[in-house]
From Swiss-Prot:
Keywords: Cytoplasm, Hydrolase. The gene is ureB. This is Urease subunit beta. It catalyses: urea + 2 H2O + H(+) = hydrogencarbonate + 2 NH4(+). The keyword Cytoplasm applies. Its EC number is 3.5.1.5. GO terms for cellular component: urease complex.
Length: 106
């Protein structure tokens, strides 16, 4: 095996089947590229990214684990988000939630 190599079965792999999703339009108003990882609580990303943060609360990018999306300065694009699952508790990031999402979902 080569470090970083994947051994997967042939065919398509379905990600996040059955989970709630939403789409948001995001625009980078900053002067530098901003990269957002697959499991970052999207409502807490860099403030230079402008979008409906309330809609994004409790969601992350709907992309494969360990990958990221890069937003270049001035770039505007639509992304798909997927709801956090499991215990639905968020800690860290920018410290805006620090606990169960349902308490903050009002």
């Amino acid at each position: 095996m080569i470090p970083g190599e994947y051994h997967v079965k042939p065919g398509q792999i379905a990600l996040n089947t059955g989970r709630a999703t939403c789409r948001v339009v995001v625009e980078n108003h900053g002067d530098r590229p901003i990269q957002v990882g697959s499991h970052y609580h999207f409502a807490e990303v860099n403030p230079a990214l402008k979008f409906d943060r309330q809609q994004a609360a409790g969601y992350r990018l709907n992309i494969p684990a360990g990958t990221a999306v890069r937003f270049e300065p001035g770039q505007k694009r639509e992304v798909e988000l997927v709801a956090f699952a499991g215990h639905r508790a968020v800690f860290g990031f920018r410290g805006e939630v620090m606990g169960p999402l349902e308490v903050n979902d009002e």
